[in-house]
Design a protein with these regions (language model features):
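Metal-dependent active-site segment of extracytoplasmic phospho-/sulfohydrolases and closely related
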Residues: 36, 259-298
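A Trp-anchored, charged/polar loop motif used as the substrate-binding/catalytic surface
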Residues: 183, 212-227
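Structural motif
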Residues: 28, 157, 199-201, 234-238, ...
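Phosphate/oxyanion-binding active-site loops and adjacent basic polyanion-contact surfaces
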Residues: 137, 211-219, 257-261, 338
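N-terminal catalytic scaffold of extracellular/periplasmic and nuclease hydrolases
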Residues: 20-165, 171-189, 195, 287-348
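Hydrophobic h-region of N-terminal signal peptides that target proteins for export
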Residues: 10-19
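Bacterial N-terminal signal peptides that target proteins for export
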Residues: 1-8
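Active-site His/acidic residue clusters
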Residues: 125-131, 203-206, 222-223, 227-267
Length: 348
C-alpha cells in the first residue's frame, strides 16, 4: 500500500510538472549594476509604486564568471543569454571561444519575434551578448555592430548615434544600406511600419534614457510590435544608467535610472497582467559600486547612498519573476540557471 501511494504521488507530481503552463512571451528586464542596495534605494525612491512589489516570486543570483569571482557585463549577460559561463570581456562564446546559441537566436528559430532595447550604445556588452558572438568585446567592436545589424532580431533600439562614423564604427549612412529601417527619433520610430527596425538614439551622460525616446516609450512600442506575432516573442530590456552612474558614484543619476527602469517595468507588467501568457524576469547582471544605504539621522529619518568601490562587486543580486514559469526562478540560483530556464521556455 505504501509503495502504491508513493507511485501514485510520483505520477501526480510528474503530471503537474508536465502540465505547468509555458509562457508564450518572455521579457527579460535587466538593471545593469543593480544589486541588493539598489533595490532598497528603489523602494525608498518609488514607495508603493515600486513595480517589484507586483512580482510574487523572488530569487537570488550568483554572478561569478568563468575566470573571475567578479563578473563584467559581457560575461554576466552571456550567462543569461546562453546558460553557460564565459570569461570576462567575452560575448556568448564558451570559455574556449566557441560561439554558443543565445536565447534570442533560439527564439528566432522557434518562430518567435525578438527584440532588444537599451539606454546605452546598442552594441554595448549586455545587448551584444544576446545579438552577437566575440572573444573580446573591446577588440571586436565593428564586427559586433555588423553582427547586430545583419542579425535576425526584429527590433534593436539603443543609443550610440554620437559614435557612428568615428574610429572603427560604421556611419549612419552605412547602417542605412542594410535591410533594416534605421530611425533616429521617437517620431520616426512611431511612424515606421517596417518589420526590421534599428533605432539609434542619443546616448546620454551616465547612460540614462534619451528624453526624446524614454525607455518606457521604447518598451511600449516594442511590445506592441512584437506581440503581433502569433508565435509569441522574446524581448530584452536594459537600463544601463544604473551601472554607469554607480561606477561614477553619481547618486542622483542612480536614482533617475532606477526610476526609469521602474517605469519601463510598469509597462511590461501591465501588459503581462492583462495577458497572463507572459513571463517577466526583472534582475540585475551584477552589483556595481559596493552601494550601501545609510541613515542621515535626525528627526527626518532620511537616507543616503554610500559607495565603497568604483568597480563591480561579487555580490549576489535579487531577481523578481511574474507569470507562467516564474516559480522556477525562486531560491538561490546561478546566473547560468537563469539562462537555461529562459532557453527552455523559448524552444519549441
Amino acid at each position: 500500500m505504501r509503495k502504491f501511494v508513493a507511485n501514485l504521488l510520483a505520477v501526480l507530481f510528474a503530471t503537474c510538472v508536465v502540465a505547468a503552463p509555458r509562457p508564450k512571451n518572455v521579457i527579460l528586464v535587466i538593471g545593469d549594476g543593480m544589486g541588493p542596495s539598489h533595490v532598497t534605494a528603489a523602494r525608498w525612491i518609488r514607495g508603493d509604486k515600486l513595480q517589484f512589489l507586483r512580482m510574487p516570486v523572488t530569487g537570488l543570483v550568483a554572478t561569478f564568471s568563468a575566470d573571475d569571482a567578479v563578473t563584467d557585463s559581457a560575461a554576466s549577460a552571456s550567462a543569461y543569454a546562453t546558460g553557460m559561463k564565459t570569461n570576462n570581456r567575452a560575448l556568448s562564446v564558451d570559455a574556449n571561444g566557441n560561439p554558443r546559441k543565445t536565447v534570442l537566436e533560439v527564439a528566432n528559430e522557434s518562430g518567435k519575434a525578438t527584440g532588444v532595447i537599451t539606454t546605452t550604445d546598442f552594441w554595448d556588452a549586455t545587448p551584444a551578448a544576446f545579438l552577437s558572438h566575440s572573444k573580446d568585446r573591446y577588440d571586436d567592436a565593428r564586427s559586433i555592430v555588423q553582427q547586430i545589424v545583419s542579425g535576425k532580431a526584429d527590433v534593436v533600439l539603443g543609443g550610440g548615434s554620437d559614435l557612428l562614423g568615428k574610429g572603427s564604427f560604421p556611419s549612419l549612412a552605412e547602417l542605412k544600406k542594410s535591410d533594416r529601417v534605421v530611425v533616429t527619433s521617437r517620431a520616426e520610430l512611431e511612424a515606421t511600419k517596417a518589420r526590421r527596425v534599428l533605432g539609434v538614439f542619443n546616448t546620454q551622460p551616465n547612460d540614462t534614457e534619451d528624453p526624446d525616446a524614454p525607455l518606457w516609450v521604447l518598451t511600449k512600442w516594442a511590445i506592441g510590435k512584437l506581440s503581433a506575432d502569433p508565435d509569441g516573442f522574446f524581448l530584452l530590456i536594459e537600463n544601463e544608467g544604473i551601472d554607469t552612474a554607480s561606477h561614477n558614484h553619481h547618486s542622483d543619476d542612480v536614482a533617475k535610472a532606477l526610476t526609469e527602469y521602474d517605469e519601463a517595468l510598469r509597462v511590461v507588467l501591465d501588459f503581462a497582467a492583462a495577458r497572463r501568457d507572459t513571463l517577466v524576469i526583472a534582475v540585475g547582471d551584477h552589483e556595481t559600486g559596493g552601494l550601501d544605504i545609510c541613515c542621515e539621522g535626525g528627526e527626518d529619518k532620511g537616507w543616503r547612498m554610500e559607495w565603497s568601490t568604483p568597480d563591480h562587486t561579487g555580490a549576489a543580486i535579487p531577481l523578481f519573476a511574474f507569470g507562467p514559469g516564474s516559480q522556477s526562478f525562486a531560491g538561490y540560483i546561478d546566473n547560468t540557471d537563469v539562462g537555461k530556464k529562459l532557453l527552455s521556455f523559448v524552444r519549441k
